[in-house]
Amino acid sequence: MKKGVLIALGLLLLWACRKEQQPEVPEPLLAVPQGFPSPEFPSDNELTPARFALGKRLFYDVVMSRDSSVSCASCHAPHLAFSDSVATSPGAGGLPGKRNAPTLANVAYQPYFTREGGVPTLEMQILVPIQEHNEFDFNILEIADRLKTDSVYSRMSQAAYGRDPDFYIITRSIACFERTLISGDSRYDQYQFQGKSEALTDSEKRGMDLFFSNKTNCSSCHSGFNFTTYAFENNGLYEVYPDPGRFRLTEDSTDLARFKVPTLRNVAVTSPYMHNGLLPSLAAVVEHYNSGGKNHPHKNPLIKPMGLTAQEKADLLAFLESLTDEKFNKNPKFK
């Protein structure tokens, strides 16, 4: 009897140990949330583990800048939804940046890039900070020369694209990694798409109703699954703008001081706000729109004084904070 019990206990312990040793199922490289379309990858840059790994390594490597002082992650920190906490991020040599670093969350869905929309693909956008004097202040061919002397990069480049490090693998691998930065599991998403009615508080629900109402017109610019129309708007931040915005690209006078509408996903962790980081907090942003902004001939006519009460402003802020995706901002896969 004792022998049988001992055998049974031994088998039970063996089964328990084997159960504990079962490897965890790795998280997929690309997870598309409910309510989101699948992002498109170019035919010459489809997602593979090798390309993801190479792009991620380059994203965090200061080898990308002339003096090896800054990387992509220096201005796009993962815990801040891949944005920065300062108005304008310092570049190589400590030179001040010209514009606020936007979040990279859901960058895969953007139809064009930079604040004025002058870059048509994510692969091409990778070149912008490299060449910009106030950012990396470098040349992509010189970066490639650096990478060719690194045996790890040479091996990873061959595994990812079947070629040695060059401009092609730099732009494509980083773009491939960035397309996986998809955020869509905020408490708002849990409420809206996952059927969790208790995911939002009463204040957040009131703020949501206000956000989508004609009283605020927030959703006229911040709509869709990514809370942006990607249109170019003047929001009355100044009467005279130091930055010409989209006019810099088109030289059309009606585009003066118009900038691409940003996503509001994770907006609570991406302060400061606006194209130049002028507004330090979400409360300041709400107050700006509540006041109707400054007078400018190209200001969107929907931006006008709202007359929000203190409670309505608090509810609106609460809703905006519910758009934070904590899992995304803490995901070790992206770090």
Label every model-predicted segment.
Residues 109, 136-141:
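Short sequence/structural segments immediately N-terminal
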Residues 135, 180, 187-189, 199-200:
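Short His/Asp/Glu-rich catalytic/ion-coordination signatures at enzyme active sites or charged loops
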Residues 54, 140-159, 163-184, 278-335:
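C-terminal capping alpha-helices of c-type cytochrome domains
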Residues 5-12:
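Sec-dependent N-terminal signal peptides
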Residues 21-128, 189-297, 329-335:
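Short glycine/threonine-rich turn/loop motifs
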Residues 14-16:
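C-terminal motif of bacterial Sec signal peptides marking the signal peptidase cleavage site
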